Amino acid sequence: MTRAVTVLATGPQVLVQDLGRPGNAHLGVPPSGALDPPSLALANRLVGNPGGAAGLEVLLGGLVLRAETSCSVAVTGPATPALVNGVPRDSPLHLAPGDVLALGTPVGGLRCYVALSGGVDVPAELGSRSADLLSGLGPPPLAPGDVLPLGTPTGVPVGVDVLVPVRVPDVLVVPVLLGPRDDWFTDPAGQLRAGRWTVSDRGNRVGVRLTGTALEREPGRVGRELPSEGLVTGAVQVPADGAPVVFLADHPTTGGYPVIGVVPPGALPLLGQAPPGTPLVFAPGTPA
């Protein structure tokens, strides 16, 4: 029997993601991978997969799958209703051949993660199965009718008593380390500390766009831009209008707007989960 699941519906977007392909910036390739790596790793652990196995990143729910083989499934991230053959079920769960899994809308975040025992076994590119919509690497967004092959399970599913869902707080406090171009801004730490922003509805896997306080440049820097230079995940880039953009996993590898600071990796998963309209403040610091 072929180990696979068939996609019946997808909602706004469903992508195959693992932990990405870091280390390829010199090729112009961003790291990609799950925007909330801890949630993907937890889902994998619950079904007995290695933490970095490929799973599904589901934006705003709506995914419907039919199992073509017996498999264990875990759904992590924000609290997301899961139904098997129309009956509500708790995660992790087991699917028999022919069972249909349907996911509702997540509460408290944007993206849930679905791990299936054996992992999603699509071809790897540059060492990763992740979909990178900016570079065009990896599989395209899933569509109804797609058949996803699954690998052979190598571990034993782990039972769980209580699965604590991810929830974005009412006000998201984001740490940021100043530099490398904080000298382009008047009192950069003070501006970041005093500013107030809201997550825009124009964000995606490339970055989170913010609306609110416009960051002011030093008088001698107004009207100027930098030659393109390297960017890292978490970079807070500030275009000429002063509205910050925090780069996420699919970010471009170079850019010419000044980067006032960098958000540490541990703070990025919640940013990737923040719905439009989420209030946000920065907590600036300096590298230890």
Task: Place the predicted regions along the sequence by residue.
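Conserved "landmark" site that anchors the functional core of diverse proteins
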Residues: 1-288
